[in-house]
Structures are given as C-alpha cells and as structure tokens.
Amino acid sequence: MTAPVTRAAPEPLAERRIALVDLLDRLLAGGVVLTGDLTLSIADVDLVRVDLKALISSVGEDVPSPWEPLREVRP
C-alpha cells in the first residue's frame, strides 16, 4: 500500500503579482470578450439601459485593422 501524498496548497491568486503590461499582453494575444448590462432606475422605473458587447484583440498581419491608416495632416 502506498503512503498518502500531501501537497501544499497553491498560492491564492491575490498573492500573485503580475505586471499590467504582461497581463495586457496575455489578454490581447488570445483576445477578450466583454459583456455586461447596466440599468439605471429610480423607484423601480428603468430609466437607462446599456448593453455592452465588445471583442478586444491585438491587430497584426494575420488580422489586419478594419480601418484605413490615418493620413498625416500638415498645417
């Protein structure tokens, strides 16, 4: 019979430190989908409703920008 293996608990996510630049690089490399709903109401009457659906990803040669490049404006 084998002896039970005890493993240390992994570090909590709050204790891990990561630079913002590294986080953005990881997120943009694979892409991020954001969705959300916001409703502003007074006395149970909905006044404003906002639905957010966004896809955020990096632009490269494989996935070109959908907008034309900006032209230089000379004074």
From Swiss-Prot:
Entry's localization field: Gas vesicle
This protein's record includes keyword Membrane: no
Signal peptide positions (record): none
UniProt keyword annotations, A-Z: Gas vesicle
Induction remark: Gas vesicle production is induced by growth conditions that promote production of secondary metabolites tiancimycin A and B.
A GO term, aspect molecular function: structural molecule activity
GO cellular component term of the entry, any: vesicle membrane
InterPro entries: Gas-vesicle_GvpA-like, GvpA
Pfam families tied to this protein: Gas_vesicle
Miscellaneous: This strain probably produces some gas vesicles from the probable gvpO-gvpA-gvpF-gvpG-gvpJ-gvpL-gvpS-gvpK operon; it can be induced to produce more under certain growth conditions.
Job of this protein: Probably a minor component of the gas vesicle. Gas vesicles are hollow, gas filled proteinaceous nanostructures found in some microorganisms. It is not clear what function gas vesicles perform in soil bacteria.
Record-stated family: Belongs to the gas vesicle GvpA family.
Identification of the protein by name: Gas vesicle protein S
Species of the source: Streptomyces sp. (strain CB03234)
Source organism phylogeny: Bacteria, Bacillati, Actinomycetota, Actinomycetes, Kitasatosporales
